[in-house]
Amino acid sequence: MSVMLQSLNNIRTLRAMAREFSIDVLEEMLEKFRVVTKERREEEEQQQRELAERQEKISTWLELMKADGINPEELLGNSSAAAPRAGKKRQPRPAKYKFTDVNGETKTWTGQGRTPKPIAQALAEGKSLDDFLI
């Protein structure tokens, strides 16, 4: 809670602050507080009415669906017939580059992920990636 709200919520602090203002100013502040409080109450009541209307509409639709033999779960796609299938496993990418590692073994690289050290070293020495194309 902010310092201002703590001050407004403490009766002793309010009394001390009220000594600095005239009665007319205090009456004006009181009227403003009443207006703000009334507006806030009306907002809360409006939200409650809207929520009640929404709940009533939902219950009406549920009753209509049950009368027609429709299960609400079917609409959400939770039925076994509408269950999404697991995605197919992706085919591995074909190798795009061929290089020889430090052990003299010939290896391939798809071009994705981290660049192999032998290729990175060759690129640093000025070679082109096209030199390693299969």
UniProtKB/Swiss-Prot annotation:
Reported consequences of knocking out the gene: No visible phenotype in rich medium; double hns-stpA mutants grow slower and have reduced viable cell counts compared to single hns mutants in MC1029 and MC4100 backgrounds. In 0.3M NaCl a double hns-stpA deletion up-regulates 583 and down-regulates 86 genes, 363 of which are thought to have been horizontally acquired; 131 are also up-regulated in a double cnu-hha deletion.
One GO CC annotation, please? cytosol
Q: Name one Pfam family in it.
A: Histone_HNS_N
| Subcellular compartments | Cytoplasm, Nucleoid
Regulation: induction = Expressed at low levels at 37 degrees Celsius, barely detectable at 26 degrees Celsius; expression is repressed by hns and partially activated by lrp.
> Which Gene3D superfamilies does this one have?
H-NS histone-like proteins (1.10.287.1050), Histone-like protein H-NS, C-terminal domain (4.10.430.10)
Quick one: where's region Disordered? 73-94
Annotated signal sequence is: none
Matching entries from SMART domains are given as:
HNS
Which residue spans does the record list as DNA-binding?
112-117
Q: How does it assemble?
A: When overexpressed forms homodimers, can interact with the N-terminus (residues 1-64) of H-NS. May interact with Hha and/or Cnu.
Tell what the record comments on domains: Both the N-terminus (residues 1-76) and the C-terminus (residues 90-134) have RNA chaperone activity for splicing of td, a bacteriophage T4 pre-mRNA.
**Family according to the record:** Belongs to the histone-like protein H-NS family.
Record's protein name = DNA-binding protein StpA
